[in-house]
């Protein structure tokens, strides 16, 4: 969708066209703000944070295990739309509404992210729509 030109200045000016493409899929919930579901740029895939909204119904399941599962499936749908899988993920950032859910969240997360990418997991005060978790990922394209 967007082509950008990156220039590196040193003794010489080197310009390289970097393809930047928006990722969009109906298999993951649409953005609830002014952002895209994901982007590919420079050989990487970046997903926006995925909350546990069922893309078909808009429903949010109850409990951390069900919500973690849906968030992982939403991330997977965006990765799939970019032509990659969970095995290409190199970094995730996970947000929990309650750090007490850490163990239960990890149990579900580990079933999807079997290659054990680098990860940050933090508890936050609030998440959109009152959900219990959110996951964003960076993958090799």
Give the label of every model feature segment.
Residues 2, 16-19:
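Acidic, Ala/Val/Gly-enriched low-complexity intrinsically disordered segments
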Residues 19-141:
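Short, polar/acidic, helix-capping and beta-turn segments at strand->helix junctions
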Residues 1-8:
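Short, small-residue-biased leader/transition segments that mark boundaries at the very start
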């Amino acid at each position: 969708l967007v082509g950008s030109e990156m220039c590196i200045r040193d003794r010489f000016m080197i310009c390289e066209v970097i393809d930047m493409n928006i990722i969009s899929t109906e298999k993951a919930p649409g953005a609830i703000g002014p952002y895209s579901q994901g982007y590919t740029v420079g050989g990487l895939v970046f997903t926006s944070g995925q909350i546990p909204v069922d893309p078909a119904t808009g429903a949010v399941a109850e409990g951390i295990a069900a919500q973690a599962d849906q968030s992982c499936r939403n991330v997977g749908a965006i990765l799939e739309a970019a032509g990659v899988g969970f095995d290409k993920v190199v970094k995730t950032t996970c947000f929990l509404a309650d750090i007490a859910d850490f163990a239960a969240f990890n149990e579900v997360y580990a079933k999807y992210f079997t290659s054990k990418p680098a990860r940050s997991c933090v508890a936050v005060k609030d998440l959109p729509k009152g959900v219990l978790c959110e996951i964003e990922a960076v993958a090799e394209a």
